[in-house]
């Protein structure tokens, strides 16, 4: 995983079937010198075709689209282009929908009512730190944890985490950045990123949201 420079220009693509909404997002981000809109699509199929030629850093992805929706498109992006961050941008604010999208790999989730500042912050944060949590995602994930029974597939019983891995996982759940965690545990940011990837493999999770859910289920952090 790359250790991004905070002054890099972030390449962004958007997939949404409403042209007016796409234009609004592009306009709201046009004044940001560190954001470059590189592609737009009206459905998931068109987006995947574009990604064969253009590699954005971040994708803003709608859920409800014709031909190929966001729910189908997200896992394809994560499988084919694992380095691309995906922010779901939708009218849905249903907790079960949000937690599902985060579990299968979304790096964040915003409603379409989110202001331009929130969208910009989410883009910057997922680019630099891999994930962006807000009140909506936090409530959705905790709601999902309270209603979903722990299963062997969601929390493997034979997982053995080292003390260092547990410490780093707890710090991630406190929303510490990679650099902050590296300073606390006295490791390089690259090593912290490698441990984070190893944690995903060990716990059978695909995203930071999945790691948070695992940590709560395993009793490593408390639900608030």
Task: Describe every region a protein language model picked out.
Residues 8-21, 25-29, 59, 161:
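Conserved acidic segment of CheY-like receiver
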Residues 65:
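Receiver (REC) domain active-site loop signature in two-component systems and cognate sites
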Residues 154-191:
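Helix-turn-helix DNA-binding segment
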């Amino acid at each position: 995983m790359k250790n991004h420079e905070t002054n890099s220009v972030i390449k962004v693509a958007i997939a949404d079937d409403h042209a007016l909404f796409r234009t609004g997002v592009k306009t709201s981000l046009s004044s940001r010198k560190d954001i470059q809109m590189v592609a737009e699509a009206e459905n998931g199929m068109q987006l995947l075709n574009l990604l064969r030629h253009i590699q954005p850093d971040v994708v803003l992805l709608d859920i409800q689209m014709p031909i190929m929706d966001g729910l189908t498109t997200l896992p394809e992006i994560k499988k084919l282009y694992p380095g691309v961050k995906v922010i779901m941008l939708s009218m849905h604010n249903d907790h079960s929908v949000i937690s599902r999208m985060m579990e299968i790999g979304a790096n964040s989730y915003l409603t379409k009512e989110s202001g331009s500042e929130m969208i910009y912050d989410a883009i910057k944060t997922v680019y630099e730190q891999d994930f962006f949590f807000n009140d909506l995602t936090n409530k959705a994930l905790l709601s999902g944890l309270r209603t979903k029974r722990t299963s062997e597939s969601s929390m493997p019983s034979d997982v053995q985490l080292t003390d260092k891995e547990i410490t780093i996982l707890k710090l991630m759940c406190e929303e510490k950045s990679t650099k902050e965690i590296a300073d606390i545990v006295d490791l390089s940011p690259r090593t912290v990123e490698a441990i984070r990837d190893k944690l995903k493999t060990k716990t059978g999770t695909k995203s930071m949201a999945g790691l948070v859910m695992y940590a709560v289920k395993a009793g490593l952090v408390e639900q608030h």
